[in-house]
Amino acid sequence: MERKSSLKVRVQKLGTSLSNMVMPNIGAFIAWGVAASLFIATGYLPNKALDTNVVGPMLKYVLPLLIGYTGGYNIHKQRGGVIGAIASFGAIAGSTVTMFIGAMIMGPLSAWILKKFDEKVQPKIRTGFEMLVNNFSLGLIGFALMVLAFFVIGPVVAQLTEWVGIGVEAIVKVHLLPLANLIIEPAKILFLNNALNHGIFTPLGTEQVAKVGKSVLFLLEANPGPGLGVLIAYAMFGKGSAKSSSWGAMIIHFFGGIHEIYFPYVMMKPAMFLAVIAGGLTGTFTFQTLGAGLTAPASPGSIIAIMGMSPKGWGPHLVVLAGVFAAAVASFLVASIILKSDNSDDDSLETAQAVTQAAKAESKGQAVTEPNLHSDITTDNIHQIIFACDAGMGSSAMGASILRDKVKKAGLDISVSNQAISNLQDTANTLIVTQEELADRAGQKTPRAVHVAVDNFLATSKYDDIIASLTNGKASGSENAAHSTQADSAEIDLNQIDAVVFAYGIAKGSATMGQETLRSIFKQNNVKIPVSTASYAHLSDYNAKNILLVTTIAQQGQAQQAAPNAQILVVDSLVTTPEYDKLVARMHK
């Protein structure tokens, strides 16, 4: 078990090291994609001068140099970035093909060599000679590696790139490209999505764009169709909180491009892997058959970003949409069969996530522990909170935003940020929040930090426990508050309620998702009560006994102070909670 776990972690690290060279530079790829779609001969605004002097040089020099610099920086900070760019330039100049792979090799390699040199030499430098040695060592080592890259790395990588390109073209010609989704879809759920998309498909796809103006490779991993189909199936045929929360998850997944949000829905029923694979196969087959492609990577994988990166004209946009919706239909059909044939009574998303977490821990040879928070989570021990994920953006940014709002409302002076796991620094007085699947890597990277693992960055109940711990509240007190809330909610009669209002602070996201969840439950049960959202600053407008305010444990006091006459439902999470179903059930008694 340990060998499998360590192998999995090593594969994740390798994939992450590749994606971490590309992800920070996605904006540059998008800028180049926009320039290409506008100024090449078949673009919206053909311009030979800009095509020759901007689009071409940016592809050949700027993008690979950015990758080389970033790869070096990730190894040895600024000095590593500089020597990474120098060495990468040698590979670029020594080849006629776009040297993304060469930059991915020379950037980290040259930075590692310089780092080892610095570790050996810097402690022996006499006072006053530091700048001289540092500058000349970087320059001379960089020069040597640049020449090596020009004569060796550039030509070798060019030949390898040509062979890979021939292989991809052969696969496309015999219509076998859809089979790639047999690997892609399960790999996404195992948090290798960024490694696949930005470590493999982005370099190869950019090469294709330079030749034919578009590439289907940009659509293989970014296609939101498979996840959309699964979420629609849960919305129609699911049970409990998995059903009610799927509507909000759909919005974040399809329009926000945060694909991680549908991963728990797949992991709670392993047969759902068949649904996303079916969706991926169908979508890629449709893309390939209709000749779909994008001009640059779509990051995040939002339908908005995908449409923005589609080539000129209605036709290219429509064929991309056709592939997305074909994938959604296929995954929906398979997921629907799985859900309708499932006779289990318990279909709680929270329960399934807990079971999944325990199964993962057992499969990694770890002890299955109770989900209590670490006793060291106090204001004396924690000075910063970092949400860490594979790429350091997307889902972790959403989680950081949610907790940052809670920290501010609690009056705590603690910074909350998000980073890629590979960029974490092992410092004390730090709380690292990461997904269970990535907890091993985060623990290895920062052994001195306090760690909290969640199955979903939107699982805000743990965030309330973190706030309770930081404000010197005991875990048992949090549990008592939850039990008190449940007892109080039993007294709420929807027959006496004329409106339901979800309260929010600065960020409105979770309140909007909760609003859509409750609306869905009301619609299914033919309840005609309007549901809306309101900021805490305007809750006084709803200070009446026939109004039900929905808030979280951390903000309960603020809601009661603003609207003392209103009825208040306090929940662990505005997004997924069993209290909504219980309210409706009591109404019909």
UniProtKB/Swiss-Prot annotation:
The modification Phosphocysteine is found at C389. It is a multi-pass membrane protein. Residues 1-25, 74-136, 189-275, 340-589 are cytoplasmic. InterPro entries: PTS_EIIB-like_sf, PTS_EIIB_2, PTS_EIIB_2/3, PTS_EIIB_mannitol, PTS_EIIC, PTS_EIIC_2, PTS_IIC_mtl, Sugar_PTS. The keyword Lipid biosynthesis does not apply. GO terms for cellular component: plasma membrane. GO terms for molecular function: kinase activity; protein-N(PI)-phosphohistidine-mannitol phosphotransferase system transmembrane transporter activity; protein-phosphocysteine-sugar phosphotransferase activity. It comes from the Bacteria. GO terms for biological process: phosphoenolpyruvate-dependent sugar phosphotransferase system. It is an enzyme of class 2 (transferase). Keywords: Cell membrane, Kinase, Membrane, Phosphoprotein, Phosphotransferase system, Sugar transport, Transferase, Transmembrane, Transmembrane helix, Transport. Homodimer. The phosphoenolpyruvate-dependent sugar phosphotransferase system (sugar PTS), a major carbohydrate active transport system, catalyzes the phosphorylation of incoming sugar substrates concomitantly with their translocation across the cell membrane. The enzyme II CmtAB PTS system is involved in D-mannitol transport. This is PTS system mannitol-specific EIICB component. It comes from Streptococcus mutans serotype c (strain ATCC 700610 / UA159).
